[in-house]
């Protein structure tokens, strides 16, 4: 889709994770489509490992374990840049199988998607794996809309509309009511979680309201300082 937008054929707008490379080629509309929570990761783990994860109290301890990730995901490079060990897979579903077989110890998933994914997994394959959300791995990772560099008018119009949706509450309402993301609420559920904040060397960090408009409402937001994120 990047090439199609660059060449201004077939597509007028597309969504994707933030990166220096994409922002160099396209106009990124800096209104986060998930409110800044894309980089907030819970862990899919083996059910028998719950106690082990209860006892993880530092990033150094997590670095002794191995994450499963798809080899082509930006998250893989983000984790490796912070010194986390990663077992790479070619297909999304393979991550669950590798975790079952002990090839890795955890599979980090965005909190907006993890609950529906583990529910689907358990229906298909049983209850060997669970979602562990007492420990969150957090890194800055935005989700932008992109348009061709020559399409300034479209970019401005989309930015105006998204800002209006944030300000009138309708954007948040979509996330609150969508069946994939409604489990995030009430946000008080996220009080008292253990956080490990790491750096993202792949994107420009924007300190704007629109980049983190939903994340700012989470009870742990004040614990996050991306400028002090660890490598």
Q: Where do the language-model regions lie?
A:
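Extracytoplasmic small-molecule ligand-binding "clamshell" domains
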Residues: 1-23, 158
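Short helix-initiation/N-cap motifs at beta->coil->alpha
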Residues: 1-4, 87-101
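A ligand-binding cleft/hinge motif common to bilobed small-molecule-binding domains
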Residues: 13-26, 108-128
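Solvent-exposed loop/turn segments at secondary-structure junctions
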Residues: 19-22, 50, 72-76, 93, ...
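Periplasmic-binding protein-like
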Residues: 36-42, 123-156, 181-205, 212-217
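Ligand-binding cleft/hinge of the Venus flytrap
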Residues: 55-61, 71-91, 118-126, 230
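Ligand-binding clefts/hinges and TM-proximal coupling segments of bilobed small-molecule sensing domains
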Residues: 70-81, 162-230
């Amino acid at each position: 889709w990047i090439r199609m937008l660059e060449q201004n054929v077939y597509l007028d707008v597309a969504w994707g994770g933030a990166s220096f490379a994409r922002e160099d080629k396209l106009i990124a509309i800096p209104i986060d489509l998930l409110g800044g929570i894309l980089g907030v990761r819970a862990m899919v783990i083996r059910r028998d490992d719950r106690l082990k994860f209860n006892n993880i109290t530092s990033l150094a301890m997590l670095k002794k374990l191995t994450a499963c990730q798809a080899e082509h995901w930006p998250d893989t490079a983000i984790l490796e840049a912070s010194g986390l060990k990663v077992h790479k897979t070619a297909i999304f579903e393979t991550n669950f199988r590798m975790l079952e077989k002990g090839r890795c110890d955890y599979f980090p998933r965005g909190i907006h998607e993890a609950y529906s994914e583990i529910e689907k997994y358990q229906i298909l394959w049983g209850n060997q794996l669970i979602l562990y959300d007492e420990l969150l791995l957090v890194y800055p990772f935005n989700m932008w809309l992109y348009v061709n560099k020559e399409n300034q008018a479209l970019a401005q119009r989309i930015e105006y509309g998204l800002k209006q949706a944030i300000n009138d509450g309708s954007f948040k309402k979509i996330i609150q009511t969508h069946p994939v993301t409604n489990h995030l609420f009430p946000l008080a559920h996220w009080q008292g979680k253990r956080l490990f904040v790491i750096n993202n060397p792949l994107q420009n960090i924007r300190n704007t309201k629109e980049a983190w408009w939903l994340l700012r409402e989470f009870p742990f937001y004040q614990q996050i300082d991306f400028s002090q994120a660890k490598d």
